[in-house]
């Protein structure tokens, strides 16, 4: 309201449809938000104004006050599941759901925190899966390392097992903070008795995901 220039701060703004009436109210709308009604940006979102007073734009991650955030070409902060492959080829808000359901691999995806926070995720998250990966109907534990999901690398078919329907399933033991956990190729943590073909043996993981040793009773 005072007309001061926004510098080194976040602002929550509505997307402009570049309507002439809007531009009469604020001559900077077109410059700041750059989205048309046909673009897939959220109707509202966070934008970061740099020390120069100019909004940051660019389909990339940016370090702000010691934390990384992801943006699209219009400067809108992205959050939660982000399709990293699609983000680089479009100016629209590439959140989850831009690809055909199940067409992406978890390797393509990045996870940043909810819109209220938005910075790059690290650690354990119990959450719904990615729509692009086809796991959005399930709530599971995932481990995120600098925005990337830990998952079983299915690059070698001889390291796969098969489920009761004959579908190939990859399960891999991954060491996190000195303890082993099991993940499938979609990044979902696994529990119970798991056969790890790469290790030629069975392992048991409790309900919290920890690999057990010694005698196990149910």
Indicate where each model-derived feature is located:
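Extracellular adhesion/carbohydrate-binding repeat motifs centered on closely spaced tryptophans
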Residues: 1-218
């Amino acid at each position: 309201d005072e007309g001061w220039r926004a510098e080194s701060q976040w602002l929550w703004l509505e997307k402009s449809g570049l309507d002439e009436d809007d531009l009469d109210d604020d001559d900077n709308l077109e410059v700041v938000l750059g989205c048309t009604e046909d673009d897939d940006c959220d109707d509202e979102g966070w934008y970061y104004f740099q020390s120069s007073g100019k909004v940051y734009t660019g389909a990339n991650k940016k370090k702000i006050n010691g934390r990384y955030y992801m943006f699209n070409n219009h400067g809108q902060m992205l959050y939660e599941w982000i399709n990293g492959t699609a983000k680089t080829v479009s100016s629209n808000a590439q959140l989850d759901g831009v690809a055909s359901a199940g067409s992406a691999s978890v390797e393509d995806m990045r996870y940043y925190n909810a819109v209220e926070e938005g910075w790059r995720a690290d650690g354990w998250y119990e959450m719904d899966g990615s729509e692009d990966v086809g796991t959005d109907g399930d709530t599971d534990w995932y481990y995120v390392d600098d925005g990337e999901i830990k998952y079983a690398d299915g690059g070698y078919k001889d390291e796969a097992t098969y489920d009761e329907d004959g579908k190939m399933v990859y399960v891999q033991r991954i060491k996190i903070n000195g303890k082993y956990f099991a993940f499938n190729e979609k990044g979902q943590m696994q529990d119970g008795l798991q056969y790890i073909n790469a290790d030629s043996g069975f392992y048991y993981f409790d309900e919290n995901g920890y690999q057990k040793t010694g005698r196990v009773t149910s």
